[in-house]
Amino acid sequence: MVRILLIVVVGVLGAIALLEIGLRLLFGFGNPPIYKADEKIGYLLAPSQRTRRMGNRVEINEYSMRGSSLRPAPDPDTLRVMVLGDSIVNGGWWTDQDETIPAMMASLSQKRQKGEAVEVLNASANSWGPPNQLAYVRQFGLFDASTVVLVINTDDLFSKPPDPSVVGRDRNYPDRKPPLAIVEVFDRFAPSQPPPESSPPVAVPRDPVGYNLDAIREINAIATQTDARFRLAMTPLRREIGEPGPKDYELKARDRLKSLAETENIEYIDFLPIFNDHPQPETLYRDHIHLSPEGNRLVSDRLIDN
C-alpha cells in the first residue's frame, strides 16, 4: 500500500514537473515581462529584461524601451528616430522583437538609406495614451532623435490619466515573476485585485479628448524645441473599417484631432482611409485593435515613405 502511494506521489510530482517545464519552454510562462509603477508616467516596463513568450523574443533596454541597449545620443553617422506608442507600437508578447513597427521601420530604412545607419527607438507600453507618452518624454527626453513619431489609435483619444495602481494588481501588469509557470497560468483566470484603499482615485478629466489633445500638443512642442521633426499617425479600430465606419463620438474626436494637426502644423497620417483602400483589410489585424505582421508592415512602410 505504501509502495503504491509512493508511486502515485512520484507520478503526480513528475507530471507537475513535466507540465512546468513544458509551460516554460513552449509558451514562456513563468517569465512574464515585468512592470514598475511611476508616479508621473503611471507605469512602464521594468528596465533591462529579456524573455520569450509564445516563441516571441521580448527585450527591454535600460530606458524601458522595447529594444537593445543604446547610448543616450546617436553616433554622428547614425539617423535616430523615436517612436512613441502603446501596445500597437510595443507589440506585446504576441509580436517578436523583429516584427514590431519600429523594428520594421529600422529594417526598411536601412535598405533605403543606402548604407546610412538608422536607429528606431520603441518607447511604448500596453495601454499607454498621450499623457503617459508625454510623461515619458519629460522624464527621459528624446535621446537626440531627429524625428519623433507618435502612433496612436482611436481609443487613445479617450485615454485616462496615468494610473500607477495597476502595477502588481492587474494581471496584465505584474511587478514580479511568479514562483511557478503553473501559478501564472492559474492567475490568468483569477480576478484582478481591487485598488488598495490607500490609493487615491485617478481623477477623470471632464473633456477626455481635449485632455489627450493637449498632451499631443505638448509632445509636439518638446520636439519642436529640440529641432526634431514631429509626426503623428493614428490607426483605426477594426470595427471602423468599412461601413458604418466610426461612431459619431469618434468622428467628432477625429475632427478635433485633425483640427489640432492643422492648427499646430503637425504632419498627420490617418490610416483609416489607407486601411479602407486595402483589398483585404481584415488581414491587417490580429484582433479588434492590434495589428498583424502584415498590418505592422503596412504602417511601417507608410511611416518610412512619408
Task: Annotate each predicted stretch with a short phrase.
Residues R57, V81-M82, I88-D175:
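Conserved SGNH/GDSL esterase-like catalytic core that processes O-acyl groups on lipids
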Residues F27-L108, R112-Q113, F275-H278:
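Membrane/wall-proximal cationic-aromatic binding patches
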Residues T78-L79, E116-V118, F143-V148, T224-R231, ...:
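Loop/turn elements at helix/coil->beta-strand transitions in domains of secreted/extracellular proteins
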